[in-house]
Design a protein with these regions (language model features):
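Long, hydrophobic alpha-helical transmembrane bundles and adjoining juxtamembrane helices/loops
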Residues: 1-7
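Hydrophobic cores of alpha-helical transmembrane segments in multi-pass integral membrane proteins
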Residues: 9-28, 45-68, 72-99, 108-134
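Interhelical loop segments of eukaryotic multi-pass membrane proteins
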Residues: 29-37, 99-103, 135-137
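Non-cytosolic membrane-interface motifs at loop->transmembrane helix junctions
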Residues: 37-44, 104-109
Length: 137
């Protein structure tokens, strides 16, 4: 296809989040492994986060060609790093709640907060760029 590199990255993040959402949804129907992942509301939030992210990056992939400021690897790579951090911490939290790992939940909350703040900073930067783009004549 004739899609630019940055749009491909944004679309890849969208597809990865959607696949994660699909896997999480399918786990709900397998009782033998459901207890590993879906033990508390924090872990169930995986799918809701993934759904929002997949739509967000699908939209970014459609408009990234016309917003040149977003065509920097640091935006997409930073957000992908933060997103993967959130998913990994939430997965580890699920294993801890299931009793498979012994990690203090306070440490997991700290990591989750750090990755969440990083994600929020990226979204704020994206909104600022979008506002500046809309205000241009």
């Amino acid at each position: 296809s004739n899609i630019q590199t940055y749009a491909k990255k944004a679309l890849l993040i969208s597809i990865m989040a959607l696949l994660f959402l699909d896997v999480e949804g399918n786990i709900m129907f397998i009782p033998e492994i459901r207890w590993l992942f879906h033990r508390n509301d924090l872990v169930i939030a995986h799918a809701h986060v993934a759904m929002g992210i997949s739509v967000f990056f699908m939209v970014i992939s459609m408009f990234i060609n016309s917003i040149k400021e977003l065509q920097k690897s640091i935006y997409l790579n930073s957000y992908l790093f933060a997103l993967l951090g959130i998913f990994i911490v939430l997965s580890i939290s699920g294993f801890t709640v299931a009793g498979l790992l012994n990690i203090p939940s306070q440490n997991l909350w700290i990591l989750r907060t750090i990755f969440g703040c990083f994600t929020f900073i990226f979204i704020s930067a994206f909104i600022q760029i979008g506002i500046k783009h809309l205000l241009l004549p």
